[in-house]
């Protein structure tokens, strides 16, 4: 399997935008192939990338559970589910996208989850990078077979509430039994005139130090991000000199050599 890069943080802090900006970087740098996984049921990574979502892993799982005997003749359940998963995989010129979708309903999902998890693991082996946009609880990664994360980005906006959510996520890692090799905090929506971490508020930095995780990137407030959102444009079309694009590039170029 390629390198696993995970992004986690409180909803509304710029987590999915950060994930989309990373996909933008990898596609422009042409250092893929990359598989982007939208593992947050409330996320819209596909939308930020300008991709239409036809199906999700959650849809496949729920539809199968409603009619587990509805497998076409000549196929077994494993082959049928793998066929549906291949259909749910969105293939773009520079990246592929898999949407995990809705969470489980009632009933026993052990068999179908085992098949879907195994397929996802095998699929990920075909890519140089696996970028996972997570829900705050990190449930998707905790259920993966290996649980290995080469780089975990903990995303917060420039607020104590966002940072405290990062602290809670950080505190869950041991319980989730995730094998995290490297991690760092990404602060979004910082003032455009902020040059580096030395300009961050003292109370904010005190809480960062209490968490014990290094800040690896500052993503400035970028009016283009709001413009693109209002115009429903893909963040892949952002100009290369956009402040957010430049900041993401500088961050990833420092991180890639160490993972």
Predicted regions and their residues:
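Walker A/P-loop phosphate-binding motif and the immediately C-terminal alpha-helix
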Residues: 3-41
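Conserved beta-strand scaffold positions in the cores of enzyme catalytic domains, especially
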Residues: 4, 36, 95-97, 215-218
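Active-site signature of alpha/beta-hydrolase-fold catalytic machinery across serine-
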Residues: 21, 25, 48, 144
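N-terminal phosphate/diphosphate-binding loop that engages ATP/GTP or pyrophosphate donors
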Residues: 28-93
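Cytosolic-facing regulatory segments adjacent to core modules
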Residues: 79-91, 96-134
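Conserved catalytic-core segment of NTP-binding enzymes
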Residues: 111-218, 227
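C-terminal alpha-helix
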Residues: 247-259
């Amino acid at each position: 399997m390629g390198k696993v890069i995970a992004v986690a943080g409180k909803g509304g802090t710029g987590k999915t935008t950060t994930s989309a900006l990373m996909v933008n970087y990898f596609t422009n740098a042409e250092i893929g192939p990359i598989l982007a996984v939208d593992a947050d049921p409330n996320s819209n990574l596909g939308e930020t990338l300008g991709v239409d979502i036809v199906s999700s892993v959650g849809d496949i799982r729920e539809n199968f559970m409603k009619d587990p005997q509805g497998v076409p003749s000549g196929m077994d359940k494993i082959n049928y589910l793998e066929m549906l998963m291949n259909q749910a995989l969105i293939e773009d010129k520079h990246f592929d996208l898999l949407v995990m979708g809705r969470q489980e309903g009632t009933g026993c999902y052990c068999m179908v989850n085992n098949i879907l998890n195994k397929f996802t693991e095998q699929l990920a082996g075909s890519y140089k990078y696996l970028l996972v946009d997570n829900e705050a609880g990190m449930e998707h990664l905790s259920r993966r077979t290996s649980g290995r994360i080469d780089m975990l980005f903990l995303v917060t906006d420039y607020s104590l509430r966002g940072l405290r959510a990062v602290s809670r996520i950080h505190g869950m890692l041991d319980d989730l039994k995730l094998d995290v090799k490297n991690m760092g905090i990404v602060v979004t929506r910082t003032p455009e005139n902020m040059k580096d971490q030395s300009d961050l508020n003292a109370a904010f930095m005190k809480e960062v130090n209490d968490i014990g995780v290094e800040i690896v990137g500052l993503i400035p407030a970028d009016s283009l991000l709001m413009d693109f959102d209002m115009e429903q444009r893909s963040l892949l079309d952002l100009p290369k000199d956009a402040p957010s694009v430049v900041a993401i590039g500088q961050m990833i170029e420092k991180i890639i050599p160490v993972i």
